Amino acid sequence: RRQRQMCIRDSDMGPLIDANALKSVEEKVKKAIEQGAELLCGGHRIGTKGYFFEPTILINCTQKMDIIQEETFGPVLPVVEFTEVEDAIAWANDCEYGLTSSIYTQNLDMTFKLIRALKFGETYVNRENFEAMQGFHAGWRKSGIGGADGKHGLEEYLQTQLVYLETKG
């Protein structure tokens, strides 16, 4: 993998934004392990220059762990296994944050069931979490104060005025 500044064309992954972000991700991973998560891979900073952190997968995570309850903003994937979709929905919605959810399935009926049930401002289906510029970055609950992208975000700064004009012609 090529970790370097994102402005370099063949980068696979760039750095975190600053030293505080790197420290926060390190601390969250460490605390998750202390709380019982198992480190499957990653979990460490890369090198001594820059703010690079290894892509990290944690398994055996529980709902009470900070890594689940708080937004991490780093390359960390806490994994939880479910056998019943209703349990996964309830578990996902049992959080103070609601920025994004992701669904991976080829079952269209299941897709729409999940979209209706998940309480998140954005849902990505069979793709990574990267919004379209014309979209609306809309976190629910403690994930922001509404959308700020695209036409919908711009409209938040405008005030509508209706004018009705009749002329004798």
Please give the residue ranges for each predicted region.
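Short secondary-structure junctions
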Residues: 36-45
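Short beta-strand to alpha-helix junction loop
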Residues: 16-26
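Short linear capping/connector segments at secondary-structure termini
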Residues: 9-14
